[in-house]
Amino acid sequence: MSTDRLTAHGVFVEVEGLGVWLSGASGAGKSELGLELVSRGHRLVADDAIEFRIDAGNPAYLIGRCPPLLDGFIEVRGLGILNLRRLYGDASVLGEHRLDLAIALDARTEPSADERLTGRRSTVNVLGIAVPEISLPRRVGHNLAVLVEAACRDHRHRAAGYNACDDLVARQAQHLIAQAAAAANPAPAASATGSPVEPHQQD
């Protein structure tokens, strides 16, 4: 078995310029989510079987592609096999892409208090490379396609050094500091005319 190649289960799509590996248990809705993302203008790389290899030009990255036999096809429960090139045009399918983010469709309990702020974030090891992974709760009524798009945009900002949770915590800290300073140095009381009250001078 090659140590620089791996065939993995799931759906591989290009979203917002990022290569996203959708994983989860059988029946989790990976292919349906992939189809919805394609309908929103994103591109399918592979469904069901994804061939990952280490990028020869940059060993720190992985490249994912579809086996030639399955190129452009997706299997959706209730619809069967669909040819996306026929349905959405050649631009809906991409030959290969770098793997940037893994998203696991998760049917576990609700996120903890900390996870509500930070998200369920970890890494998954693929051929010795740690790939950022987000676990998205799968619930009735959730628009997973929108969540995946938002996750990709947020991932780009994080890669550039911005973290929304850290930003909010810093903003709250600044607000508390300002409140404490205002309490320690109260403003002079105002008169009925709106001007500060001057101390009474005795003759």
Set out the residue ranges of the language-model regions.
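Pre-Walker A adenine-sensing motif
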Residues: S2-V13
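Accessory recognition modules or surfaces
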Residues: T3, A25, A56-A60
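A short, structural micro-pattern
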Residues: T7, G95-H97, G128
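A short, compositionally biased
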Residues: T7-H9, A46-D47, T118
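Glycine-rich phosphate-binding P-loop
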Residues: E16-L44
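Conserved nucleotide-sensing/catalytic segment adjacent to the nucleotide-binding pocket
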Residues: R43-A104
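Conserved NTP phosphate-binding and transfer environment spanning the P-loop NTPase/kinase superfamily
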Residues: D100-D203
